[in-house]
């Protein structure tokens, strides 16, 4: 793996440093760009990356690029300080432009990343294929456990209302992070649950400042993939879960019908953490999708 910093242009010709991790064969014929979810960073998708790359005896002809979203992980906030969906779309388009991958380009988004990717592709991001994992198929407040989303809205509103020091501390409160983690994990494997909680403890609070989190959260609950689906002509793979508390499975089927060319694959026994709990079947669906014949 190669750890790299890219200088990406933003509003007013200002530039921002985006940290990304470059896996696999740099000369591969296919480049897969990953966009992680809200409050995470590139670590969240590493199990899927490992499954996709294979082992040394059977390496995949694949390059995988996993940036940290601006303001999260190792990436600096966006220039201008506005972390709206439109700003993240502009950033992704510029990041791909700077990356300048050769050959086939595939862009994958998980959770909030699915909204960013869908909006960017609908806005003209040039990519051959699209993959959305745990896509936000409908407004978050309408999900099976919309009450939890409303509690999250109150939590972030409270964090924004407090003095900066106390608001920042509330956002990083380990007990609240643990509650979020417990509510999302569906596995009954005690060891896997501990590992998931550890990942959230380590990476869920690595953000630049309070404003970044507040603005990104507002973007994540104000939009969903269904707004952009009809404008995405590229072959699209949707990987959904039957126990996702944020988007019910029925909404995923409706979402599929909005795309001109989408395939829906459902993984059972998992919720919004496919990337942690079911990386093997997710990677298998991705490999199958990437191997499909495409019209010339």
Q: What positions do the PLM features span?
A:
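Flexible "cap/lid" loop of the alpha/beta hydrolase fold
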Residues: 130-165
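Conserved alpha/beta-hydrolase "acid-adjacent" motif
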Residues: 245-251
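Short beta-strand/loop motif that positions the catalytic acidic residue
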Residues: 232, 238-240, 244
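Conserved HGGG/HGGXW glycine-rich cap/lid loop of the alpha/beta-hydrolase fold
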Residues: 22-74
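Short glycine-enriched nucleophile-adjacent loop
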Residues: 114-125, 130
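Active-site loop/oxyanion-hole signature of alpha/beta-hydrolase fold enzymes
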Residues: 11-16, 21, 63-112, 122-123, ...
């Amino acid at each position: 793996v190669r750890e790299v910093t890219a200088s990406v242009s933003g509003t007013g010709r200002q530039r921002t440093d985006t940290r990304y991790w470059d896996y696999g064969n740099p000369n591969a014929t296919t480049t897969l760009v990953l966009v992680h979810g809200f409050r995470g960073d590139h670590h969240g998708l590493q199990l899927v990356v490992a499954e996709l790359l294979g082992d040394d005896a059977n390496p995949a002809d694949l390059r995988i690029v996993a940036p940290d979203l601006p303001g999260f992980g190792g990436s600096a906030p966006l220039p201008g300080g506005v972390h709206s969906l439109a700003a993240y779309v502009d950033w992704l388009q510029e990041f791909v432009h700077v990356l300048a991958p050769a050959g086939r380009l595939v862009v994958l988004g998980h959770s909030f990343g699915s909204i960013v990717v869908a909006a960017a592709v609908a806005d003209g991001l040039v990519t051959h294929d699209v993959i959305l994992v745990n896509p936000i198929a409908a407004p978050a407040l309408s999900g099976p456990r919309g009450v939890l989303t409303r509690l999250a809205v109150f939590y972030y509103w409270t964090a924004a209302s407090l003095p900066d020091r106390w608001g920042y501390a509330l956002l990083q409160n380990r007990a609240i992070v643990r509650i979020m983690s417990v509510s999302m994990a569906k596995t009954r494997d005690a060891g896997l649950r501990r590992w998931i909680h550890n990942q959230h403890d380590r990476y869920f609070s690595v953000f630049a400042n309070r404003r970044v989190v507040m603005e990104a959260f507002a973007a994540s609950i104000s939009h969903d993939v269904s707004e952009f689906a009809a404008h995405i002509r590229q072959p699209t793979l949707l990987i959904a879960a039957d126990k996702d508390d944020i988007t019910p499975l029925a909404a995923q089927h409706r979402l599929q019908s909005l795309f001109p060319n989408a395939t829906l694959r459902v993984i059972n026994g998992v919720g919004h953490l496919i990337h942690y709990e079911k990386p093997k079947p997710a990677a298998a669906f991705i490999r199958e999708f990437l191997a499909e014949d495409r019209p010339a």
